[in-house]
Amino acid sequence: MTTINLGVPEVPAKSPLAPRRKSRQINVGGVLVGGGAPISVQSMTTTLTADVNATLQQIAELTAAGCDIVRVACPSQDDADALPIIAKKSPIPVIADIHFQPKYVFAAIEAGCAGVRVNPGNIKKFDDKVKEIAQAAKDHGTPIRIGVNAGSLDPRILQKYGKPTAEALVESALWEASLFEEHDFHDIKISVKHHDPMVMVQAYRLLAAQTDYPLHLGVTEAGPLLQGTIKSAVAFGILLSEGIGDTIRVSLSAPPVEEVKVGIGILESLGLRPRKLDIVSCPSCGRAQVDVYKLAEEVQAGLQGFPFPLRVAVMGCVVNGPGEAREADLGVASGNGKGQIFVRGEVIKTVPESQIVETLLEEAMRLAEEMQASGAFGDDQAVGAPIVTVQ
């Protein structure tokens, strides 16, 4: 065999991600945040918190989707009164989101919430209340998130900078953190959110360089599902690849479950969380001899919740089809109204197009049974869905 030297130097294999930023670690209701702990995914309920049943139902849906920590709004006394039962019955840690009224901070702490988010920009006389808040939080072991938002920046900071710049967000956050530190309270995480992902990225870079508190990433008011997903993926991708970020919330004008799906997907794509279901599909073209869109959707739907990691290739034409299918645990290379079914690189049968999805699902179940019997994966890995590649 002839060896061709292209003159490209060998580069030692290493992660394309920077090492995680070293940060303090806090405990949010049993979920560790910072200090090298896995990056957690958060969301926020859209129900009236006072409607306990509706709120707990939505929290259950978020939990099933993979949410690690949930936040609930608390704008009224009725909402505050609902916090004890919600905090007690929720399957995941509950954080109370407090604006305007400092009395609800104390109510949330007393209710047993796993954490409290405070917005120093709009809580009345917040600076004067820090000593009491710090003492109450310390007494109950309740971490506090200092959540600075571009849309509700402290008026004093806004007057100084003229607009919510990255520097303004960071100054506000660090100032409030310093007030807690004066009272020997350090069980803190910080967020500096902005609707512009590039301003947000700059703010978190500045913040990460000046403090070791764990950081909660978020693009505030990111927009509808598509736009918000793009903004969050760009911002989170940049920061997480630089090792910045300890917990994330994708803010979308969409059902909260979608926020969780996007957040988990971002972490999976960066290799920061084990992959589950991943649809990698071609945009289709004139070479496609099957309905790739329909096939991809049916395979994805059929394999939701698959209990083991599995790579499945669903190929729409003969250009890359056979090669990709052979590289997968399970796959199909389609053409001329039929599909060759591959299992672990070997063709096992050819089926009509109408039977492709059914056959793939049957083979996936058979592989799952083999994996279960062999004990290839522990209980902690026996969740989620397979990796599906569609071409």
From Swiss-Prot:
Cofactor: binding details: Binds 1 [4Fe-4S] cluster.
Record keyword Lyase present: no
Superkingdom: Bacteria
Assigned keywords, A-Z: 4Fe-4S, Iron, Iron-sulfur, Isoprene biosynthesis, Metal-binding, Oxidoreductase
Cofactor(s) required for function per UniProt: [4Fe-4S] cluster
Catalytic activity, reaction form: (2E)-4-hydroxy-3-methylbut-2-enyl diphosphate + oxidized [flavodoxin] + H2O + 2 H(+) = 2-C-methyl-D-erythritol 2,4-cyclic diphosphate + reduced [flavodoxin]
InterPro entries the UniProt entry points to: Dihydropteroate_synth-like_sf, IspG_bac, IspG_bac-typ, NO2/SO3_Rdtase_4Fe4S_sf
GO molecular function, one term: iron ion binding
Binding site for [4Fe-4S] cluster: C282, C285, C317, E324
Pathway: Isoprenoid biosynthesis; isopentenyl diphosphate biosynthesis via DXP pathway; isopentenyl diphosphate from 1-deoxy-D-xylulose 5-phosphate: step 5/6
Biological process (GO), any one: terpenoid biosynthetic process
Listed Pfam families: GcpE
Enzyme class: oxidoreductase
Enzyme Commission number, as recorded: 1.17.7.3
Record's keyword annotation contains 4Fe-4S: yes
Described purpose of this protein according to its UniProt entry: Converts 2C-methyl-D-erythritol 2,4-cyclodiphosphate (ME-2,4cPP) into 1-hydroxy-2-methyl-2-(E)-butenyl 4-diphosphate.
Protein family membership: Belongs to the IspG family.
Protein name: 4-hydroxy-3-methylbut-2-en-1-yl diphosphate synthase (flavodoxin)
